[in-house]
Amino acid sequence: MKIGLIGSGGMGEGMSCHIMDNNIEVWGYTNDYSKTQEHYEKGHISGCVTNIEYLAYVVHLDSKEYSSTGKTPGVFVLTLPTEAVDEAINELLEHCMSGDIIIHNGDFNFKDFRRRSETLSKLGIQFVDCDTSNDSVQITGSKTTISVCSSIFKSLAPNSKWNEFVTLGALC
C-alpha cells in the first residue's frame, strides 16, 4: 500500500513514521519543500514531491487498476490546520480518481465532516475523519472505507483498540 501525505509538519512526520513501520509507503507533500525533503532525508517518509499533482500521480502508480484487480484505491491523508483542509481537498480533487479515499487527520467537527463527505461521495471519492490523541484513534466514515484503510489506523494506535464511528445515511 502507498499513501500520499499532505502536510508533513510535526503531526504528519510522527504519523508517517508509525505508518511506515507497517510497510506502507508514505509520500509527502507540504508547501515548504525543504521541510518535506528534510523528513525524507531522516527516513521519516518514503519520498517527497513538490506539488499535489505529482503526489497523486505517484500514489496512483500502483493503484490505477484497483477496481478490476482488487488493489487498494489511492489514499491521501491530510494533516493540515482546519482552515487549510478545504483548499487542499479542492486542489487534490483535480487529480483524484473515482474510488480514491481522503482521510482528514485533525480536529473533528461533525458538520464539516458531513459537508465534505456528502460533497466528495457525489464525485465517487470516499472521506474519512481520523482523530488521533496519544495512543487512541477515533474514525468516522463508511464501514467499507474504514476497512480498506484499517492497516493505516492500526499503525497509529498499535497497542490499543481503535474506535470506528460508521456514519449513517448517504455514506453507507
Residue ranges and their predicted role:
Residues 23, 27, 76, 134-154:
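Short beta-strand and adjoining strand-loop segment in the mid-core
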Residues 129-136, 158-172:
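Conserved Rossmann-fold dehydrogenase catalytic segment
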Residues 8, 31-32, 80, 105-107, ...:
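Fold-independent oxyanion-binding glycine-rich loops
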Residues 17-20, 37, 53, 90-93, ...:
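Predominant activation on well-ordered alpha-helical scaffold segments within soluble catalytic domains
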Residues 1-66, 70-75, 99, 128-129, ...:
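NAD(P)+-binding Rossmann beta1-loop-alpha1 motif at the extreme N-terminus of oxidoreductases
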Residues 122, 151, 155-162:
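Alpha-helix capping at helix-to-loop junctions
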Residues 9, 13, 30-33, 49, ...:
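Electropositive phosphate-/nucleotide-binding environments in soluble metabolic enzymes
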Residues 53, 69-78, 82-138:
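Rossmann-like NAD(P)(H) cofactor-binding subdomain of soluble oxidoreductases
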